[in-house]
């Protein structure tokens, strides 16, 4: 049995295979760009889906039913509404049936079911099981028709009335609490929190940066909003142990505090690819051939309920666009700011983006182009300003001096004149 278990979980089937894996494994587990270790299928199964649900199934869980029943309140809050209603209906009906049987037994033992008996009954007008069941419903729901009532003939009957009233209050409190907790769950708040379809890698302040965009579709704020990210990939340790999902934190400004965001308009989250980044040694070619997943998480408190919500998404390696930037979505109008969500997922290619890794860029192995080249965001802002000026009757010749033959998706060496531009909200 021990040998079978060893073969089942061992990644190395023989000493020769172990030597091959040891020679192919490198730091960070990505490979050297020329050859890549494939210990699993080429196409990675997404660990976190785009909608935030985790693609995980639990099997062979011992005593699962007992564990779920031990935490029955959380179980009722997590299950679907239809099952929740079924459980609550059963709770009421079973409690009515149980106490109806108790009152029927009391009447039976006391002889109240005998119509010829003239002595005082424990519960008046309870001479059948149906009558006992109706009395149980009237007692627990406090309907009080006044036709059936308990007498002082049997102390046990009085005790059962008191006990059923307490049980009914407990059931009502449990149901109301579970329903309110389920209705107040901030899970649906995630429907109005969105991530961009693709992440991008581009230059930002002279450094390669991984970026993705988040947005809030509601006007209500997300209090204490902050972001974090993790890179998931498989790797083999120096001892030959295979780790299917090694989790590596991606720094998005936790130390400096810029991971906390004011999410009123869409914001671009920036991860600077430095020597501490797991992407430091990866070039564009390595990214194209890599097999990893970046899980991004947005957390905050719902303003209406003060309950914490968490919105998740993920990006596979083939969903990271190298040398792209996001189109601007925030524009300054005369008395307000306008957010155009039709541009939220759109990107454009930035020419002259280094194709090398951040390490090669830091070691001056790649010569950067002119940093003052014309940017597409500026062209979009100027174009939008021209449209506003033309609507306000401003002559076209005074709006901008930008040459008309500039391509919106290409950079040109045209200096910008100082003028108030529309700005995108980014960190």
UniProtKB/Swiss-Prot annotation:
Short sequence motif Selectivity filter: positions: 142-147
Membrane topology, from the record: Multi-pass membrane protein
One CC-aspect GO term: membrane
Organism encoding this protein: Cavia porcellus
GO MF annotation terms: identical protein binding; inward rectifier potassium channel activity; phosphatidylinositol-4,5-bisphosphate binding; voltage-gated potassium channel activity involved in cardiac muscle cell action potential repolarization
Region: Disordered, residue numbers: 384-427
Sites of S-nitrosocysteine modification: 76
Gene: KCNJ2
GO biological process terms held by the UniProt record: cardiac muscle cell action potential involved in contraction; magnesium ion transport; potassium ion import across plasma membrane; potassium ion transport; protein homotetramerization; regulation of heart rate by cardiac conduction; regulation of membrane repolarization; regulation of monoatomic ion transmembrane transport
Subcellular location: Cell membrane; Cell membrane, Sarcolemma, T-tubule
Activity regulation, per record: Activated by phosphatidylinositol 4,5 biphosphate (PtdIns(4,5)P2).
Main location: membrane
Positions of the UniProt region annotated as Polyphosphoinositide (PIP2)-binding: 181-208
Post-translational events: S-nitrosylation increases the open probability and inward rectifying currents.
Keywords: Cell membrane, Ion channel, Ion transport, Membrane, Potassium, Potassium transport, S-nitrosylation, Transmembrane, Transmembrane helix, Transport, Voltage-gated channel
Site feature Role in the control of polyamine-mediated channel gating and in the blocking by intracellular magnesium, where: 172
InterPro entries assigned: Ig_E-set, IRK_C, K_chnl_inward-rec_Kir, K_chnl_inward-rec_Kir2.1, K_chnl_inward-rec_Kir_cyto, K_chnl_inward-rec_Kir_N, Kir_TM
Motif segment (PDZ-binding): 425-427
Residue numbers on the Cytoplasmic membrane side: 1-81, 179-427
Source organism superkingdom: Eukaryota
Any Pfam family: IRK_C
Family the UniProt entry places it in: Belongs to the inward rectifier-type potassium channel (TC 1.A.2.1) family. KCNJ2 subfamily.
Intramembrane runs of residues: 129-140, 141-147
Protein name from the UniProt record: Inward rectifier potassium channel 2
Matches recorded under PANTHER family: INWARD RECTIFIER POTASSIUM CHANNEL (PTHR11767), INWARD RECTIFIER POTASSIUM CHANNEL 2 (PTHR11767:SF43)
Subunit (UniProt): Homotetramer. Homomultimeric and heteromultimeric association with KCNJ4/Kir2.3. Can form heteromeric channels with Kir2.6/KCNJ18. Associates, via its PDZ-recognition domain, with a complex containing LIN7A, LIN7B, LIN7C, DLG1, CASK and APBA1.
Function: Inward rectifier potassium channels are characterized by a greater tendency to allow potassium to flow into the cell rather than out of it. Their voltage dependence is regulated by the concentration of extracellular potassium; as external potassium is raised, the voltage range of the channel opening shifts to more positive voltages. The inward rectification is mainly due to the blockage of outward current by internal magnesium. Blocked by external barium or cesium. Probably participates in establishing action potential waveform and excitability of neuronal and muscle tissues.
């Amino acid at each position: 049995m021990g040998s079978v278990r060893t073969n089942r979980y061992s990644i190395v089937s023989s000493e020769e295979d172990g030597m091959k894996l040891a020679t192919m494994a490198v730091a960070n587990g990505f490979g050297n760009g020329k050859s890549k270790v494939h210990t699993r299928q080429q196409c990675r199964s997404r660990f976190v889906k785009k909608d935030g649900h985790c693609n995980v199934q639990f099997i062979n869980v011992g005593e699962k039913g007992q564990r779920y029943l031990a935490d029955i309140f959380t179980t009722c809050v997590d299950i679907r509404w239809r099952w929740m209603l079924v459980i609550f209906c059963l709770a009421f009906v079973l409690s009515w049936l149980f106490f109806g049987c108790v009152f029927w037994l009391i009447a039976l033992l006391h002889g109240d079911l005998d119509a010829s008996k003239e002595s005082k009954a424990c519960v008046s007008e309870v001479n059948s099981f149906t009558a006992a069941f109706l009395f149980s419903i009237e007692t627990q729901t406090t309907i009080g028709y006044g036709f059936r009532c308990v007498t002082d003939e049997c102390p046990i009957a009085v005790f059962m009335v008191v006990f059923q009233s307490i049980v009914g209050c407990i059931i009502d409190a449990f149901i109301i609490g579970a329903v309110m907790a389920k209705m107040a769950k901030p899970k649906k708040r995630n429907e109005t929190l969105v991530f961009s379809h693709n992440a991008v890698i581009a230059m930002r302040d002279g450094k390669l940066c991984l970026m993705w965009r988040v947005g809030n579709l509601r006007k209500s704020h997300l209090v204490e909003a902050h972001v974090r990210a993790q890179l998931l990939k498989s790797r083999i340790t120096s001892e030959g142990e295979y780790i299917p999902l090694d989790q590596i934190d991606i720094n998005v400004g936790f130390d400096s505090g810029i991971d906390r965001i004011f999410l009123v308009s869409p914001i671009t989250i920036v991860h600077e690819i430095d020597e501490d980044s797991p992407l430091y040694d990866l070039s564009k070619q390595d990214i194209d051939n890599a097999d990893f997943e970046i899980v991004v998480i947005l957390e905050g408190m719902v303003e209406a309920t003060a309950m914490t919500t968490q919105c998740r998404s993920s990006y596979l390696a083939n969903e990271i666009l190298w040398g792209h930037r996001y189109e601007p979505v925030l524009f300054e109008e005369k008395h307000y700011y306008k957010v155009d969500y039709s541009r939220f997922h759109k990107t454009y290619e930035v020419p002259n983006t280094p194709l090398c890794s951040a390490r090669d860029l830091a070691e001056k192995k790649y010569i950067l182009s002119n940093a003052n080249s014309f940017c597409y965001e500026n062209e979009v802002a100027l174009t939008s300003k021209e449209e506003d000026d033309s609507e306000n009757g401003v002559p076209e010749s005074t709006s901008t001096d930008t040459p008309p033959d500039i391509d919106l998706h290409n950079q040109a060496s045209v200096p910008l004149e100082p003028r108030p531009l529309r700005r995108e909200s980014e960190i």
